[in-house]
Swiss-Prot record:
Membrane topology note: Peripheral membrane protein
The protein's name: Protein transport protein SEC23
GO terms, biological process: COPII-coated vesicle cargo loading; intracellular protein transport
Gene Ontology cellular-component terms listed: COPII vesicle coat; endoplasmic reticulum exit site; endoplasmic reticulum membrane; Golgi membrane
Length: 748
């Protein structure tokens, strides 16, 4: 079974598929033992059990009965993780190999339990809308939100908060008149203050029950308030607060988010809910100010942040981090949708999405298809008509005594529960084996790292076991448990270990570690760490003779890894010069969300060539791939770009494709568009689509991604072989040459 087939079954992909047998050997592998785990990975034939799972009796283990358990005819089972003997349920007595319960079936290494405990409340959605925007963009946003109401479950609860200079909490329970409560936009209200202001006795018709907590009137079932909500949305207008010349609009996004998180916490703490922020510009009021209201005050840049010259940055980060921590505690999620050319402060707000599993969508305006389609795709449904999102989840990682959990990197938060299987060596968010997943979807993928605890030699083919238990609130109103159990061999044989290396998963895992380090360390230090790691890995696993460059050889399991690292070093994830702080935060957020294949596309984009005399084919991400008679399709995950070579572009401008005798040219021009459309179908967020040609202004998006093997200062390579890239970046060939020299010289 290859790595991708195993991923399709269990949603797990390891850097090393065989583990070193001792702690000392594990310390020499350079790339840590890690897995990319997608808890809700879609699987057509997923086994489903309509009852509660059976747990190991060992309180330090509590693993779930699984196919790797040994079943005793006497009516007990032995836990493979801790070795505890546990009794089988009475109705399992007398089971045979031909009559196994579903959870013991070998095909049930991943299984979903639908537990008997129902969820007492439906999912909650709270819109937080910025009204400081032009009429056309506000109208487009309102139209999209009204369309989306039909996609929510009918019993879902919904609420509305709007903000400009002030914050308005709308009372959807008021049918006769539109009623809202106004809060100052320059104050941070705590839960008690909000409760005192909003939780007032409500006059009701005689005989009608009255809520003990009247705050519930701000979050009501869509099926009951769709008309009132639609009416309020249709009549929303631009914030009336005057904006003087030379000023930015007064926006109270920080206060609005604080009120929203407190309102959900006071009403539905511990039940799945999403706060959805629609921002058309930066917060210009404290709390949470991103930039001051005067236009003469510039927005912070990467350089300002590095030099500690961004005067609002640390205070804003601290404020939004506090909201994120409170939201995680309550089990809620925050999504951020930006619809403007300006920065809204995604960098400062990143913890709101990062810790709660929320999404970030970055678009130029709410009128764009990037926003509209991305937002509506959030409400995609499964075959049974339920939303493809889980709420208020937890991830519990169990492992056998040979292993310990080092940490997790992804959109989750630590539950700070320490167990015996937690390693002292932390990678990412460590110190625990249990994490909060406020939101989890079939796309959410987590990098989980392990440490070998074993110190003495093991017998050949000794097995280790890892179990991932994901508990979450399903959109159908049930609590579910997705259990994935995997087994890996422990070996002291370096050749066996080498053969088990998955260089694609390893590259993605190392990219996540790199981004995690980038949040804390200087950018140059992070790049040096990446380089040292690559040199050490090659020194350990490459074949070479000391001081002889030409003898350097990497086996097929490692041959692509340096290439991935080269493109990672050049990517927008680490090279922030041409991106705003918000763009960098957005790109990094998405990389931390996606699975192995999508992450690799972000690190090393794919390039497909179309020509008249051959079938479409993948080509090198290299400047030599640009030809006058070719069309190239570039997929960076964030952009889908069609590039027409010089000759093709001239033919297209001349309109040859419209002439009957040039039907083959017309077909050639359509082929990349059809393939691009297929790429756009399921992707979230929706990528930006670019159609350009040789000499076009947007061709820079392609050139910036290409390996510059033909540049202005490399005259010998220029000619018929590709296009000239105007850059001082080193090419992959030069990078590999330097790598070989450093490896064979023994340098670190």
């Amino acid at each position: 079974m290859n790595f991708e087939e195993a991923e399709d079954i269990n949603g797990v992909r390891f850097s090393w598929n065989t583990f070193p047998s001792t702690k000392v050997e594990a310390g020499k592998t350079v790339v840590p033992i890690g897995s990319l785990f997608t808890p809700l990975k879609f699987r057509q034939d997923l086994p489903v059990a309509d009852y509660d799972p059976h747990f190991c009796l060992n309180q330090n283990c509590r693993s779930v009965l699984n196919p790797y358990c040994s079943v005793d005819p006497s009516g007990s089972w032995i836990c493979p993780l801790c070795g505890t003997r546990c009794p089988l349920p009475p109705h399992y007595q007398g089971i045979t190999q031909d009559n196994l319960p579903i959870e013991l079936n070998p095909a049930s290494s991943t299984i979903e339990y639908i537990t008997a405990r129902p969820v007492p409340n439906p999912p909650i959605f709270l819109f937080v809308i910025d009204t400081c925007q032009d009429d056309d963009t506000l109208q487009a946003l309102k139209d999209t939100l009204i369309v989306s109401l039909s996609l929510f479950p009918p019993n879902a609860l919904i609420g509305l908060i709007t903000y400009g200079a002030m914050v308005q909490v709308h009372d959807l329970g008021s049918e006769s008149i539109k009623k809202s409560y106004i809060f100052r936009g320059d104050r941070a209200y705590d839960e008690k203050q909000i409760n005192d202001m909003l939780n007032k006795p409500v006059l009701t018709p005689q005989g009608t029950p009255q809520f003990a907590n009247s705050l519930f009137r701000f979050l009501l079932p869509i099926e009951e308030v769709e008309y009132q909500l639609t009416d309020i949305l249709e009549n929303l207008t631009r914030d009336p607060w005057p904006v003087a010349n030379g000023d930015r609009p007064l926006r109270s996004a920080g206060s609005a988010l604080n009120i929203a998180s407190n309102l959900l916490g006071l009403t539905y703490a511990g039940f799945g809910g999403r706060i959805m922020l629609f921002a058309a510009g930066p917060c210009t009021l404290n709390p949470g100010m991103i930039v001051g209201p005067k236009l003469k005050e510039p927005k912070r840049s990467h350089s300002d942040i590095d030099k500690d010259n961004a005067k609002h940055y640390k205070k804003a980060m601290k404020f939004y981090d506090g909201i994120a921590a409170k939201t995680v505690k309550n089990g809620h999620t925050i999504d951020i949708f930006a619809g403007c050319l300006d920065e809204i402060g995604m960098l400062e707000m990143k913890s709101l999405c990062h810790q709660t599993g929320g999404c970030m969508v970055y678009s130029d305006a709410f009128t764009t298809s990037i926003f509209k389609q991305s937002f509506l795709r959030l409400f995609n449904k499964d075959n049974d008509g339920y939303l493809l999102m889980g709420f208020n989840g937890t991830l519990d990682i169990k492992c056998s005594r040979e292993l310990k959990v080092s940490g997790l990197i992804g959109h989750a938060s630590s539950l700070h529960i320490k167990s015996p299987n937690v390693s002292e060596n932390e990678v990412g968010v460590g110190g625990t084996s249990q994490y909060k997943l406020c939101s989890v979807t079939p796309q959410h993928t987590y990098a989980i790292f392990f440490d070998v605890a074993n110190t003495s030699p093991l017998p050949p083919n000794a097995q280790s076991y890892i179990q991932f238990i994901t508990h979450y609130q399903h959109a159908s109103g049930t609590y579910r448990l997705r259990v994935t159990t995997v087994s890996n061999i422990l070996t002291g044989d370096e050749q066996v270990l080498t053969q088990s290396f998955d260089q694609e998963a390893a590259a993605v895992l190392m990219s996540r570690i790199t981004l995690f380090k980038s949040e804390q360390d200087d950018g140059a230090d992070v790049l040096r760490w990446v380089d040292r790691m690559l040199i050490r890995l090659c020194q350990k696993f490459a074949d070479y003779r000391k001081d002889l460059d030409e003898t350097f050889r990497l086996g097929p399991q490692f041959s692509l890894f340096p290439q991935f690292i080269y493109y990672l070093r050049r990517s927008q994830f680490l090279q922030v010069f041409n991106n705003s702080p918000d763009e960098t935060a957005f790109y990094r957020h998405v990389l931390m969300t996606e699975d192995c294949n999508n992450s690799l596309i972000m690190i090393q984009p794919t390039l497909t060539s179309f020509s008249l005399d051959s079938e479409p084919e993948p080509v090198l991400l290299d400047s030599v791939s640009i030809k006058d008679d070719r069309i190239l399709l570039l997929d960076t995950f964030f952009h889908i770009l069609i590039f027409h070579g010089k000759t093709i572009a001239e033919w297209r401008k001349a309109g040859y494709q419209d002439q009957e005798e040039y039907a083959n040219l017309k077909q050639l021009l359509e082929e990349p568009k059809q393939e691009a459309a297929e790429l756009l179908v399921d992707r979230f967020p929706l990528p930006r689509f670019i159609d350009t040609e040789e000499g076009g202004s947007q061709a820079r998006f392609l050139y910036s991604k290409l390996n510059p093997s033909t540049t202005y200062n490399n005259q010998s390579a220029i000619g018929a072989n590709g296009a000239v890239v105007l850059t001082d970046d080193v090419s992959l060939q030069v990078f590999m040459s330097h790598l070989q020299k450093l490896v064979v010289s023994g340098s670190t």
